């Protein structure tokens, strides 16, 4: 857990418990920009303290979860279109090179195992995605598309949790959403058709994120014990399918 949350009336204070990636500054910068350019899409930032903590307004809605309905996907597409319509001026870039390096390192470690997880790690490393670190379509990258970070009020969706935000690539961000473990119950095809990412780049970006997730939930990963038995094996099969094209 990177933070704790305290709610008092119409305000919320987020107290960071770790900030090695400069999370407080990233979140503050993103919220300041977005609250000016896209009012009511994100919380309005109020204060940033050195402890560090960030106080912001509370947004209406309930976190998304499970399988998204067509209405929810439409609203999510609207929210993402609004988010990505804002020029990412002044935001620090997403550190995609660090993600790639971390994924390679984690998958290399998984090669020491056996079974489908080791096979997927070997296969990914033998078919590594091309360089995705050059930003072709710059956007405000949310950075953490866990479904719980999208608040649904029955009509529209608002977005929270920008501690990993920055300047990023639109196609890579779409792949990040589709490959997030929290979204596995949803058929993302309608939203992907609407957002229309560059096909080849999208496929390779999905491979990157799928490999990253395997390093998180595979043996020895930081989230290895947070999911039901068989989750890592299922993820390994997903990696193999994506790499195969």
Task: Name every feature range the model reports, one short phrase each.
Residues 2-95:
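ATP-binding pocket architecture of kinase catalytic cores
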Residues 29, 72-73, 158, 175-178, ...:
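Glycine-rich, phosphate-binding/catalytic loops in enzymes
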Residues 16, 59, 146, 163, ...:
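Anionic group-transfer/hydrolysis microenvironments
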Residues 35-38, 83-91, 132, 181, ...:
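A general structural signal marking secondary-structure boundaries and capping sites
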Residues 86-143, 232-242:
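An alpha-helical support segment within catalytic cores of ATP-dependent transferases
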Residues 3-7, 127-172:
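Active-site acidic catalytic loop and adjacent metal/ATP-binding pocket
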Residues 51-69, 85-88, 104-110, 211-227:
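A glycine-centered beta->alpha junction motif in the catalytic cores
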Residues 171-198, 207-226, 234-238:
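Active-site activation/catalytic loop segments of kinase-like enzymes and analogous catalytic loops
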């Amino acid at each position: 857990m990177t933070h704790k949350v305290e709610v008092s009336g119409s305000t919320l204070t987020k107290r960071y418990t770790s900030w090695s990636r400069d999370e407080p500054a990233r979140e503050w910068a993103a919220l300041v920009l977005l609250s000016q350019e896209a009012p009511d899409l994100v919380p309005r930032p109020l204060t940033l303290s050195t402890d560090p903590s960030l106080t912001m307004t509370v947004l209406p809605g309930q976190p998304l979860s499970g399988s998204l309905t067509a209405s929810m996907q439409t609203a999510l597409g609207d929210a993402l279109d609004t988010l990505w319509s804002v020029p990412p001026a002044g935001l620090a870039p997403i550190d995609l090179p660090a993600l790639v390096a971390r994924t390679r390192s984690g998958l290399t470690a998984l090669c020491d195992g056996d079974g489908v997880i080791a096979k997927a790690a070997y296969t990914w490393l033998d078919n590594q995605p091309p360089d995705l670190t050059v930003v072709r379509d710059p956007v405000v990258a949310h950075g953490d598309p866990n479904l719980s970070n999208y608040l649904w009020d029955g009509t529209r969706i608002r977005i929270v949790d920008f501690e990993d935000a920055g300047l990023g690539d639109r196609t890579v961000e779409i792949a990040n959403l589709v490959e997030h473990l929290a979204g596995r119950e949803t058929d993302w095809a309608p939203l992907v058709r609407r957002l229309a990412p560059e096909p080849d780049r999208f496929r390779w970006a999905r491979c990157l994120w799928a490999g990253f997730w395997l390093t998180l939930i595979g043996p020895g990963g930081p989230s290895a014990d947070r999911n039901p038995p068989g989750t890592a094996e299922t993820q390994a099969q997903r990696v193999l399918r994506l790499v195969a094209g």
